[in-house]
From Swiss-Prot:
The lineage of its organism: Eukaryota, Metazoa, Chordata, Craniata, Vertebrata. Residues 13-24, 148-161, 505-519, 579-589 have a biased composition (Basic and acidic residues). It comes from Mus musculus (Mouse). It comes from the Eukaryota. Its main location: nucleus. This is Protein cramped-like. The keyword DNA-binding applies. Residues 158-221 form the SANT domain. Residues 100-116 have a biased composition (Gly residues).
Length: 1285
């Protein structure tokens, strides 16, 4: 026999022999420890061959069950002490057992028998309760107690048979690590022995380990209650392993002694996952360990690797990008004057529901806000019915993102540096060790079988059902699978699943009965119930019953107009008609709700069954209005309540998994792709995402750089309408018809106010009437964002076309076509364009310009929740369109964004506007070196503070028509073209930025000029075309060559205005000199020209604010500042004031030109200074140009004629960049230049023209090598001449 001890074959023979033992032998031996173990082995062997239901004791074991003596610790210790039982207490019948199992390696006959029995009893939990405690105890304590009696050699091997405390600890360590892998446990024990230097002969072998495993299991099975959830749907091996692991924890804390008290604690530990034991005067908290064996048990497929078990560190915040899911969602947000594309940075530990709540408030329709304020003043009885919206905001994963189902998340920890996700371990879920005690082991092992573990259960404490319900749709499939169901054992799981929710479940603990299935089923009921009954949708908004035309409209409640049209039908359509329509509406599930065909049938049953008895849903689809009126109850509460009640009633809705499939179908069959598809269809709503954090979504999407989510408004699923708590709502809904009628009246009044508030009523009414009768328009909800639909709203990919923008904005919105899909609310926040652009340019035709203030602005709260709210609204019906001017579209006010400034040809010091009037100044530059004619151009000088002209290049659209006899001079013409002469209207350019400037066409410019004073065609006429290189169109006025002019100002004082203007206008308008015409001898760098563009009224800050690049013009540029004062044409400059200007005093420029100069007499423009000035001297003239701010800053320093260069210095004139002058501090430079000019102008005896030339010469000599690329084309013109000659 000794030879057979280690032999596996002998073990098998022993098992067979033990299996053949008769029942009477077992009964006789039952009182002895060996007999007890033999009975265990035989019964369990038999059970292994034919498994019985758990809890049914083996028939032959009726006698062993009541054996109390073995239960006493004294007997056990006595058996441990005695190596050989007395013959009086050991019947002789034990000999066959001893012989049969004597081959058991070191464990004696009992060891082998218990081993065989344990292996077989692994399939059944029923055999275990009958095992005598004493027998199993003695066998576990002293395995070979009866072995030595048979064979003397056994005494030597008794060391093998005894399991010391250390051995047992090692065994349980191995059990924690490897589970029911006896060889691995044996290797673990051998390794530990080897480390301690113990002889190899003391190492337990695999058979001994197996014996000990089963003996210990048999010892504890008697105390485990197998009638509870723990045993249902769970594999026998899983029960064994989990029970032994829990027993090992209990044994570690309080020892292995099992009595009734400890048995209760063991049951509590198994069922709840944690227990508190009073031991040696201390309260010990014992938790079910989350060891690798249970991990394998819960995740047999190995999906959760060891790396995955570690908490995942995620960034603290992640950018989230929200995009509309379809055109309807885009138009809804756009109509609220909000950006449909939203980017934000969110913390990952936030709940998705909080994000949805934020968006819901941010994008609340204005009528919703008004309704909320109004409902505060309405009847208490019916006001609550109206609070629920028909559409709910849902978030969806991005279109291109890949969703991978997540294992369960135990918790998301938020620290200063990281957002850490701790996994849950149960049911293919991972969990941190700290959180395992919060899960009942039954849930850890996936006892819910096919139903899966709802995320809400992760938080539920022991036997409480207060899990953070709502259940997540997301992880149900992932969490659902327990290791027990993933292999061949899924078949028993399927069978056991219905019993979970069956009415015979009361034998379970109450907390478990509720926490598992009800939390599991909460989303199921919500999905299944609400998805297929548009009744809730038709009754969710103020009207409790649906209307015939509304039904199609409310299928997609994203269209604002059906809501308003419906308000009038509330008053007209009889209630019977509405109820009839709700029946027809039942056949058409809403487009927004995506119910798979598999879901429709069960969920319909669920709707009927889950309705409370008080509701009595009607046989067809005709639910009473009362049912629809219950949509105001909190979704979560009602979903939980309905699932609880349906559990007790055993309703079919209980068997629906979160995918809408019956729970009897194991959820592991639901592939991850189907879960992802479900998420893409249903998304996350406020209710289903209550316990879902953004960290989980982030992990699900594969840790992208940014979370790309889509949003849409879907019809409210309305699980609450079939809630069991609906009796109160039923009574509420059965309120008097007058209350309902009053409610509808108030709702209609609200909508009328919303539409009447805006003067564009006719347009909206047409659109509303068209939209209400066109159900096909609802199908546009599925239109891709870029598809052109016949609506005027811009699709998300629309490009901003400035020309269509201008045309659309200028047309009154009443002229817009009544396109059914127009997504304007009754206060059109989008001004629709004309019909010509409505359909053809629907993608790019309408640039949404909010004509009313956004709802969240401080002006938007028109309706204060006062007690006289209804009276005020009725009064508004009559007068709101007149008195509320801020609802009317404002005159177009372009956004004052400082965009990239347009490129201009010269740099100017811009004036700051005075208190009452902004000086619109135009600088006129003379380029007198052209061989054809002296050319110049005008450029308007805009103040950055001038609102009307800010970032709008002034283009001469309309030139004032004047008599031919009083033709304007060139400067006057430039002033008119700049829009600064009071007689000419200031042209406003409709542009949103520099990129959209509409250039003045050549025909317009030429016609305008020639119509004013052109005497005939001229060969030098150059039409004014916008220079495309610059976004600021400018005009260059050519000077006629044929009119020579005399040297000084005083030379021809009698030259009249018409003469010069006629001559000037004969060449028409020409564009600035191209590079081919420009002379190569222009020396001044761009910064010099910036210094020379001296506009007297302008402080230097304006140049900085304009930010236009400096461009050079010529050495001898005369910047004549034209004031925008009153112009009278008949006042010439007094020659006496100009007599001091002598040609001999003018300093020559670097090169002199024989060409006639442009300024020949003071009559070139007699109106270039304010005519109301009493003193026409130069000092008073230029003093009038100085702004008050500049005059306060002026220093009365007298600067010499040659001090320009010394004051301005070469450091300010370096040509490192085109904006080198602007990039420096302009305050000192401009102060010097302005003060120098003032001194110049105050000295009447000095020719101010020569002083200008002197200053220009000194500034240009400083840097002669700089050339301007734009004008350095190499044209062979003559050099620049002195203007005063």
């Amino acid at each position: 026999m000794t030879v057979k001890l280690g032999d596996a074959g002998s073990g098998e023979e022993g098992l067979k022999k033990l299996g053949k033992r008769t029942a009477d032998e077992e009964s006789l031996d039952g009182e002895g420890p060996g007999g007890a173990d033999a009975a265990d082995s035989s019964s369990t062997k038999r059970d292994g061959q034919t498994p019985r239901a758990s809890g049914a004791p083996a028939p032959p074991r009726g006698l062993p069950t009541p054996s109390p003596p073995q239960g006493s610790p004294q007997d056990q210790h006595h058996f441990l002490r005695s190596s050989v039982r007395p013959q009086s207490k050991r019947p002789r019948k034990d000999a066959p057992c001893a012989l049969g199992s004597g081959g058991a390696s070191g464990s004696g006959p009992r060891g082998k028998g218990s081993d065989g029995g344990a292996s077989s009893s692994g399939n059944v939990s029923g055999a275990t309760p009958a095992t005598p405690a004493g027998g199993s105890r003695s066998s576990s304590r002293n395995i070979g107690s009866s072995g030595p009696e048979k064979e003397e050699g056994k005494k030597v091997r008794r060391q093998w048979e005894s399991w010391s405390t250390e051995d047992k600890n090692t065994f349980f360590e191995g059990l924690y690590e490897h589970g029911k892998d006896f060889e691995a446990i044996q290797n673990n024990i051998a390794l530990k022995y080897k480390k301690k230097g113990k002889p190899a002969s003391m190492v337990k072998n695999k058979e001994q380990v197996r014996h000990f495993y089963y003996r210990t299991w048999h010892k504890i099975t008697k105390y485990i209650d197998f009638d509870n959830v723990f045993s249902r749907g769970l594999k026998k091996s899983s029960q064994e392993l989990y029970g032994l692991i829990c027993y090992g924890e209990l044994r570690k804390k309080i020892g292995g002694c099992m009595d009734d008290k400890n048995a209760t604690k063991l049951n509590e530990l198994i069922q709840v996952g944690a227990t508190t034991v009073r031991y040696k005067g201390r309260n010990l908290r014992i938790k079910a360990p989350m060891c690798r064996a249970l991990k394998k048990l819960c995740d047999p497929d190995g999906l959760s690797d060891e790396e995955d078990q570690k908490p995942v560190r995620l960034p603290l915040k992640v950018p989230v990008e929200l995009q509309p899911r379809n055109n309807h969602a885009w138009a809804r947000v756009q109509s609220l004057a909000q950006n449909p594309r939203l980017r934000m940075i969110v913390e990952l530990h936030r709940k998705v529901s909080s994000l949805i709540e934020f968006l819901k408030q941010k994008w609340a329709l204005h009528e919703v806000r008004i309704r909320k304020t109004l409902e505060e003043r309405q009847l208490q009885g019916s006001s609550t019915v109206q609070t629920q919206e028909k559409v709910a905001l849902h978030l969806f994963p991005g279109e291109n993102c890949t969703l991978t189902p997540l294992p369960g998340v135990a918790r998301v920890v938020h620290s200063k540096a990281f957002c850490t996700v701790h996994w849950q371990e149960g049911g293919r879920c991972k969990q941190g060790t700290k959180d395992i005690h919060s899960l009942p082991p039954a849930q850890i092992l996936g006892i819910q079988s096919g139903q899966g573990i709802a995320r809400g259960q992760l938080k539920c404490q022991r036997s409480s059902a207060e899990g953070k319900g709502g259940g997540r749709l997301l992880p149900t499939a992932d969490a659902s699978q327990s290791s027990g169901e993933s292999s061949p054992e899924s078949a028993p799981a399927e069978g056991a699943a219905p019993s979970l929710s069956s009415p015979d479940a009361p034998d379970r603990p109450h907390g478990l009965q509720d926490s598992g299935p009800h939390l599991e089923k909460t989303p199921v009921t919500a999905l299944a119930v609400g998805r297929d009954s548009p009744i809730q949708e038709s009754g969710a908004l103020p009207c409790p019953c649906g209307q015939p035309p509304d039904l199609e409209d409310e299928l997609s409640l994203l269209d604002p107009f059906p809501r308003y049209l419906k308000s009038c039908q509330d008053l007209i359509i009889p209630e019977q008609c509405r109820r009839a329509d709700t029946r027809s509406g039942r056949e058409h599930p809403p487009l927004g709700s995506v119910a798979s065909p598999e879901t429709l049938t069960p969920s319909s049953g669920a709707v009927a069954d889950s309705a409370p008895p008080g509701l009595d849903p009607q046989p067809g689809t005709d639910h009473q209005p009362d049912t629809r009126l219950q949509s105001d109850i909190c979704t979560k509460e009602l979903a939980n309540a309905s699932s609880e009640e349906s559990q007790e009633k055993g309703s079919p809705s209980e068997h629906l998994s979160s995918q809408g499939q019956p729970a009897t179908r194991p959820s592991k069959e639901v592939p991850a792709s189907q879960l992802a598809q479900q998420l893409r269809e249903e998304g996350w709503s406020l209710q289903t995402s209550e316990s879902l954090t953004l960290a989980e979504v982030y992990l699900m999407m594969g840790k992208p750089t940014k979370l790309q989510l889509e949003y849409d408004w879907l019809a409210v699923l309305g699980p609450e309408s079939q809630a069991p708590t609906a009796q109160g709502q039923t009574a509420l809904s059965r309120s008097s018809p007058s209350a309902l009628h009053q409610q509808r009246l108030l709702s209609c009044l609200l909508r009328l106010i919303s539409t009447e508030v805006h003067p564009k009523m006719a347009f909206e009414a047409n659109t509303a009437s068209t939209a209400s009768v066109r159900p096909t328009q609802e199908e546009q909800s599925t239109t891709p964002p870029g598809k052109v639909v016949t609506i005027n709203s811009r699709s998300p990919r629309c490009s901003r076309n400035p020309s269509t923008l201008r045309s659309n904005k200028t047309f009154p919105s009443a002229s817009a076509p009544c396109s059914p899909g127009l997504r304007n609310p009754p206060r059109p926040l989008l001004v629709a364009g004309p019909s010509s652009t409505g359909s053809s340019d629907s993608d790019g035709g309408l640039f949404a310009v909010p004509t009313t203030l956004p709802p969240n602005s401080r002006h938007g709260k028109l309706f204060s929740p006062s007690k006289e709210a209804e009276l005020t609204f009725r009064q508004h019906l009559d007068s709101i369109s007149i008195q509320s001017d801020f609802f009317s579209p404002k005159p177009k006010k372009l956004r004052k964004r400082h965009l990239r400034k347009p490129l201009v040809v010269q740099r100017t010091l811009l004036p700051r506007p005075s208190e009452n009037q902004s000086h619109n100044v135009c600088s006129f530059s003379i380029l007198s070196n052209s061989p054809i004619a002296g050319r110049g151009w005008f450029r308007p000088i805009q103040s950055s503070l001038t609102k009307a002209a800010l970032s709008r290049p002034i283009v001469p659209k309309v030139l004032p028509s004047q008599a031919t006899s009083h033709l304007p001079s060139a400067i006057d013409l430039a002033a008119q073209s700049a829009g600064i002469i009071p007689g000419s209207p200031l042209p406003i350019l409709d542009t949103d930025g520099s990129s959209g400037i509409s250039p003045l066409s050549s025909e317009q410019a030429t016609t305008a000029i020639s119509g004013q004073g052109d005497t005939g065609p001229h060969q030098n006429r150059d039409p004014v075309t916008a220079v495309r290189g610059t976004n600021d169109p400018f005009i260059s006025v050519t000077r006629p060559e044929q009119e020579p002019m005399t040297d000084g100002f005083q030379g021809s004082p009698a030259l009249t205005l018409p003469e010069l203007s006629k001559a000037n206008l004969q060449n028409g308008l020409s564009i600035p000199l191209p590079s081919s015409e420009s002379s190569s001898t222009r020396l001044s760098p761009p910064n010099v020209s910036a210094l020379l563009d001296i506009s007297l009224p302008g402080p230097p800050e304006d140049v900085l604010s304009q930010g236009e690049p400096a461009t050079q013009i010529s050495d001898s540029i005369i910047e004549i500042a034209i004031s925008s004062g009153q112009y009278s044409e008949g006042v010439p400059l007094s020659p006496a004031k100009l007599n001091g200007s002598d040609s001999s005093k003018s300093l020559p420029s670097p090169s002199s030109s024989p060409q006639p100069n442009w300024i020949a007499s003071p009559t070139h423009d007699p109106q270039w200074y304010p005519s109301d000035s009493a003193d026409s001297s130069l000092s008073s003239l230029f003093a009038s140009f100085i702004s008050p701010e500049k005059s306060r800053k002026m220093l009365p320093t007298t600067v010499g004629a040659n001090s320009g260069t010394s004051l301005l210095g070469p450091s300010l004139l370096d040509g490192n960049s085109r904006d080198s002058f602007v990039s420096r501090s302009l305050a000192d430079v401009a102060e010097v230049v302005d003060s120098q000019l003032v001194c110049m102008m105050n000295e009447n005896s000095i020719d101010y023209i020569s002083r200008f030339n002197d200053l220009a010469q000194e500034l240009s000599i400083t840097e002669p090598g700089r050339r301007e690329v734009l004008f350095d084309g190499g044209g062979g013109g003559n050099p620049v001449g002195d203007l005063s000659q």
